[in-house]
């Protein structure tokens, strides 16, 4: 389809109606649904709008990807017969983009050679892999109790300040180091400040590489783009795509698809015999639904339950079905989920749950104990915690850990009223071991090293299982509890206990 020109007939907030004149043969060619159209503003900047509806014979209704300030009736709009596309390839490594693929980091423009449309079909059945594989993260509590599946979808639940961003950062860091993996972060309705913090943390941890010279200038409080080393930038292991909170709903509802398109391009370009495992982060999936609800209302659709769009399940499914494993590689997604008014039956989180393979719940009560990551081991779940997938030893150890923690939770009321002395010897032993297990679930993170001064560690699943079995078998009953806090392997516990003993003497 070639170039089609129309003109603006109506502007209502972020909704723009575009009228097309009849041709010589009394017919009119309209752009297709989801095609992008360009409108040149008086200041020379281009506004992208996306076709959402055909109205009558010669009008389309579009949703703007940026503010519609300065538009007026009669302005020309051009369709090139293409949807919104995202740049791909090594050029996007370490870069920050908006929903239409334009850079927002102050660096050079990206070429659209090999660009991919953001609205795409999910992979065909014959291209999917049916093997169940665990994506080991090097984080003990996740690998043992709620293992992530390669190509799976993980929901990350947590309020403000419990460590969601730090956990996301550590996952990006560990996958980059352990599997030489690549990460894409989609900020859906993100606060601009959070996006800024995330970029700085990624530069600090070396996931995005601006070069040593820039890093030194950043630490001195400057932000000098002339100091960026572009050879280093090409070695970055993450790309960020943001549709910020202040942007129109059209941008916020599409930015997750823009990020996913980049993740798909890295997964699918794997060379023969090489598998690519991509991590895709969405923060926050609730805001994706919320933006879709706003677009639906602006287009005049009848609202469904609790005011959400009637197409909620369709929109969610269209995105989630693209996050999967193919023969070339996998996209594993970690999605932060905000639960409105803590109501899990709300249509937005309820629709998300149906797609998730694992849930990681962060708890404020655990942060109060000083245990980080503050993952709640009893609330978190995984579909692949199955002896046929993870192995019998792993499964049995995980179940024993959950049982001992559950028993400890049940005994807490008795302890708070009557004290430890009133417990039987068996229960007292259970509580003592549970407290050691609870503390051993903590771990120092590489991305938090600058705050804690403790070097981060990655723990293999074999070391994790061995450590927890030793605790539950009573081999560490004589070691003080504080030796288990914020360490990696069981050997680190023994070393820390030795140091504590020397300090006491």
From Swiss-Prot:
Residues annotated as binding ATP: 158-165
The keyword Cell cycle is assigned to this record: no
GO molecular function annotations of the record: ATP binding; ATP hydrolysis activity; proton-transporting ATP synthase activity, rotational mechanism
Topology with respect to the bilayer: Peripheral membrane protein
Protein family per UniProt: Belongs to the ATPase alpha/beta chains family.
Self-association and partners: F-type ATPases have 2 components, CF(1) - the catalytic core - and CF(0) - the membrane proton channel. CF(1) has five subunits: alpha(3), beta(3), gamma(1), delta(1), epsilon(1). CF(0) has three main subunits: a(1), b(2) and c(9-12). The alpha and beta chains form an alternating ring which encloses part of the gamma chain. CF(1) is attached to CF(0) by a central stalk formed by the gamma and epsilon chains, while a peripheral stalk is formed by the delta and b chains.
Protein known as: ATP synthase subunit beta
Organism: Parabacteroides distasonis (strain ATCC 8503 / DSM 20701 / CIP 104284 / JCM 5825 / NCTC 11152)
């Amino acid at each position: 389809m070639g170039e089609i020109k129309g003109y603006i007939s109506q502007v209502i907030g972020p909704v723009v109606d575009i009228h097309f004149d009849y041709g010589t043969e009394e017919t009119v060619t309209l752009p297709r649904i989801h095609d992008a159209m360009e409108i040149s503003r008086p200041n020379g900047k281009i506004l992208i709008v996306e076709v959402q509806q055909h109205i009558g014979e010669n009008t389309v209704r579009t949703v703007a990807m940026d503010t519609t300030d300065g538009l007026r009736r009669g302005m020309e709009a051009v369709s090139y017969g293409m949807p919104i596309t995202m740049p791909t390839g090594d050029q996007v490594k370490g870069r920050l983009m908006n929903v239409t693929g334009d850079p927002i980091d102050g660096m050079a423009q990206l070429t659209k050679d090999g660009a991919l449309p953001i609205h795409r079909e999910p992979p065909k059945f014959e291209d999917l892999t049916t093997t169940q594989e665990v994506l080991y993260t090097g984080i003990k509590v996740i690998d043992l109790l709620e293992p992530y599946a390669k190509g799976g979808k993980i929901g990350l639940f947590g309020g403000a300040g419990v460590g969601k961003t730090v956990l996301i950062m550590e996952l990006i860091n560990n996958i980059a180091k352990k599997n030489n993996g690549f990460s894409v972060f989609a900020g859906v309705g993100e606060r601009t400040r959070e996006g800024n913090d995330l970029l700085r943390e990624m530069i600090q941890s070396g996931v995005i590489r601006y070069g040593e010279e820039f890093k030194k200038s950043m630490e001195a409080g400057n932000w000098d783009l002339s100091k960026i080393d572009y050879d280093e930038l090409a070695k970055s292991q993450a790309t960020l795509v943001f549709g910020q909170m202040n942007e129109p709903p059209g941008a916020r509802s599409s930015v997750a698809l823009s990020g996913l398109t980049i993740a798909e391009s890295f997964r699918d370009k794997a060379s023969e015999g090489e598998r690519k495992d991509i991590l895709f982060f969405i923060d926050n999936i609730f805001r994706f639904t919320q933006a879709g609800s706003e677009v639906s209302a602006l287009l005049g659709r009848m609202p469904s339950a609790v005011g959400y769009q009637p197409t909620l399940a369709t929109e969610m499914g269209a995105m989630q079905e693209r996050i999967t494993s193919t023969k070339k590689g996998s996209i594993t997604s970690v999605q932060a989920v905000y639960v409105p008014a803590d109501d899990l039956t709300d249509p937005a989180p309820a629709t998300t749950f149906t797609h998730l393979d694992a849930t990681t719940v962060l708890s404020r009560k655990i942060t109060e104990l000083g245990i980080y990551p503050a993952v709640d081991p009893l609330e978190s779940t995984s579909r692949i915690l199955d002896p046929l997938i993870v192995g019998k030893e792993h499964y049995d150890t995980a179940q024993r850990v959950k049982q001992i923690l559950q028993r400890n939770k049940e005994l807490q009321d008795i302890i708070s009223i009557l004290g430890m002395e009133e417990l039987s010897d068996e229960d007292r032993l259970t509580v003592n071991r549970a407290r050691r297990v609870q503390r051993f679930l903590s771990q120092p993170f590489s991305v938090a090293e600058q705050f804690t001064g403790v070097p981060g560690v990655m723990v293999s699943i074999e070391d994790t299982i061995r450590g927890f079995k030793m605790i539950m078998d009573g081999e560490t009953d004589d070691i003080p509890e504080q030796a288990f806090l914020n360490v990696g392997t069981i050997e680190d516990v023994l070393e820390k206990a030795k140091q504590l003993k020397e300090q006491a003497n």
